[in-house]
């Protein structure tokens, strides 16, 4: 099932959600350990467990953050990953939506630059990657061209960039 991530910079009325220093501190605590108990977070930021729980729920509801399990694709049998640049003829949105529906695609972003879209594809092996790109992505209506960047070695992946 494909989901569209809410724009973290806007709320239902189009304004940016207010993130105070305490909420930022809560986010940073969860970036260090997404399973950290609310009581421990409360101790670190000076709030009660209930207040932390309410703030976390509000941050989730506003689309400011998500709490998810991050897996290692290699340990799950997915031995080939690639970033694919996609150029589109016509409207980008239907192509982006179709790509987001694909099981192998875990990341879709509309870009400005050499490509209209960048997607990340996670596959079992080279044959699976070739089939996904050649038979599924390139055949989508509106796809003009693709360029693949196969991952050879992951050097850094982090979700702890803080709240700046």
Name each model feature, range by range.
Residues 1-164:
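A compositional/biophysical signature of low hydrophobicity enriched in polar/charged and small residues
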């Amino acid at each position: 099932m494909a989901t569209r991530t809410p724009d973290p910079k806007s709320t239902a009325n189009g304004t940016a959600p207010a993130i105070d220093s305490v909420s930022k501190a809560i986010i940073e605590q969860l970036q260090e350990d997404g399973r950290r108990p609310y009581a421990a977070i409360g101790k670190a930021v000076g709030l009660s467990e209930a207040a932390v729980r309410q703030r976390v729920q509000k941050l989730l509801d506003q689309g400011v953050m998500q709490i998810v399990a991050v897996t290692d694709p290699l340990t799950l049998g997915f031995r080939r990953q690639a970033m694919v640049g996609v150029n589109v003829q016509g409207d980008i949105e239907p192509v982006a939506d179709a790509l987001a529906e694909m099981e192998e695609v875990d990341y879709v972003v509309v870009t400005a630059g050499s490509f209209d879209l960048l997607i990340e594809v996670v596959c079992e092996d080279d044959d699976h990657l070739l089939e996904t790109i050649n038979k599924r992505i390139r055949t989508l209506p509106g796809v003009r061209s693709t360029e693949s960047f196969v991952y050879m070695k992951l050097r850094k992946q982090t979700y702890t960039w803080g709240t700046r």
